[in-house]
């Protein structure tokens, strides 16, 4: 199988070499030439993928995409093969994987397919977040995805991306920026019945971020959010917030610990909430 893959890629390279230059005008004027050589490269890529030769699979898909990008009849094929190349490189070279995805995104934007472009921006962000550990760039690409989904009117998907943005700010301990984004998400959710269940969670996180920043008049800030969303006082999240206020006012960590135990018995404390609460605990200890 791998031997056949090498034969196919050699044949593709020979045909490209015969015309003297990959992007020879004479060669590219013939759509069939692009199609035939592109097919050779794709077939070789599929075989390399089957034997888990990720580098040559990625190389072959990428070369096919670059070739097809020169002919307008192959716009979707170009984008698909940039994505295929990215998937192969992701296993061995995350940065190269991102480069391929960014090229695919540009193709999808050129044909006004912002939904697919947004989906791939999310993938770029996830690679930065989980493979390269660059939260700033992850945040930037989640923001791009948010913009693209909004462009297409996909409010729920845009909100999902905004949550990722806010979570990245929290992980970087940029609590002022996180608070602003969580608040925006909560306000957007208030306008959409399908997202109303998210309001309390986003306002909880926004308020906790204000605690993390060290804002002094927390009762005033809590009042601002209850004015925005009067039903907030009916939820367990509000009860937790008021216990945190009491704990901060009295510098009594036991109140915070008891409140978290009670809240956590019903609702799991996720990683993002844990970051915030540890920061609040540290602030109380240093008062």
Curated annotation (Swiss-Prot):
GO biological process: protein transport; regulation of synaptic vesicle priming; SNARE complex disassembly
CDD domains: SNAP (cd15832)
Keyword Protein transport (UniProt): yes
Keywords, ordered alphabetically: Protein transport, Transport
One function term, GO molecular function aspect: syntaxin binding
PANTHER family cross-referenced by the UniProt entry: ALPHA-SOLUBLE NSF ATTACHMENT PROTEIN (PTHR13768:SF23), SOLUBLE NSF ATTACHMENT PROTEIN SNAP (PTHR13768)
Family named by the database record: Belongs to the SNAP family.
Protein name: Soluble NSF attachment protein homolog FPV033
The gene coding this protein: SNAP
């Amino acid at each position: 199988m791998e031997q056949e893959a090498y034969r196919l890629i050699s044949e593709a390279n020979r045909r490209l070499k015969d015309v003297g230059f990959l992007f020879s005008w004479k060669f590219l004027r013939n759509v069939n030439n692009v199609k035939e050589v592109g097919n050779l490269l794709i077939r070789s890529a599929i075989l390399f993928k089957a034997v888990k030769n990720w580098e040559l699979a990625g190389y072959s898909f990428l070369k096919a995409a670059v070739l097809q990008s020169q002919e307008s009849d192959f716009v979707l094929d170009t984008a698909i093969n940039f994505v295929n190349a990215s998937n192969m490189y992701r296993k061995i070279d995350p940065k190269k994987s991102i480069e391929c995805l960014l090229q695919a995104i540009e193709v999808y934007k050129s044909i006004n397919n912002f939904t697919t472009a947004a989906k791939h921006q999310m993938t770029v962000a996830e690679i930065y977040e989980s493979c390269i550990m660059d939260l700033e760039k992850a945040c930037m690409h989640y923001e791009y995805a948010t913009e693209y989904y909004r462009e297409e009117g996909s409010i729920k998907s845009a909100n999902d991306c905004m949550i990722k943005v806010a979570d990245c700010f929290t992980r970087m301990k940029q609590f002022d920026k996180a608070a602003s984004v969580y608040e925006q998400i909560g306000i957007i959710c208030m306008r959409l019945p399908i997202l109303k269940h998210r309001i309390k969670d986003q306002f909880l996180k926004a308020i906790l971020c204000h605690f993390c920043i060290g804002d002094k008049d927390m009762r005033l800030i809590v009042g601002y959010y209850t004015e925005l969303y009067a039903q907030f006082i009916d939820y367990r999240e509000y009860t937790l917030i008021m216990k945190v206020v009491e704990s901060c006012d009295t510098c009594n960590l036991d109140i915070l610990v008891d409140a978290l135990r009670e809240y956590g018995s019903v609702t799991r404390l996720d990683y993002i909430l844990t970051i915030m609460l540890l920061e609040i605990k540290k602030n109380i200890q240093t008062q």
